[in-house]
Design a protein with these regions (language model features):
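Short, solvent-exposed, charged loop/turn and helix-capping segments
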Residues: 45-69
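Short terminal alpha-helical segments
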Residues: 1-45
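Charged, low-complexity interaction regions
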Residues: 23-36, 53-61, 85-99
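Extended amphipathic alpha-helical scaffold segments
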Residues: 15-23, 43-50, 74-87, 117-118
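Amphipathic alpha-helical binding modules
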Residues: 72-125
Length: 125
């Protein structure tokens, strides 16, 4: 049987994979679809983390911190509309691709969110 820690660890691993994928992109034509897919995955995983932590009433300080940070991210950052606008006008423009990708990465690093995720991942690995 999978424990909540193991379950969350699996989700965190997938968030890190998506994040690293965003870091590794070279801002070339076609990357906008990848960016869109990865941010949708990350947002979905954040929603799962929130639901799981709240429903299990985990009291661990690191998970409480992660809960607050993921809620903050979801309530303060929304890239889907901007990506949709870009897809019709500028999907092949490397400078615009780089700009949206870096804005997403910066937002994930804001409030030490990715640092907390990496800390949890390293604690459990």
């Amino acid at each position: 049987m999978t424990t909540i820690d193991d379950y969350l660890q699996g989700i965190i691993k997938q968030i890190l994979e998506s994040y690293r994928h965003l870091l590794d992109l070279k801002d070339k034509p076609g990357d906008l679809e990848i960016i869109k897919t990865e941010i949708l995955r990350i947002n979905g995983f954040f929603k799962v983390i929130i639901k799981k932590i709240e429903s299990s009433q985990i009291q661990s300080d690191i998970y409480i911190k992660l809960l607050k940070q993921t809620k903050h991210f979801l309530s303060n950052y929304e890239f889907e509309r901007e990506i949709e606008t870009m897809s019709t006008l500028y999907s092949d423009d490397p400078n615009r691709l780089k700009n949206i990708r870096l804005k997403i990465i910066e937002s994930l690093q804001n409030n030490e969110l990715m640092e907390t995720i990496e800390t949890i991942y390293n604690l459990k690995s």
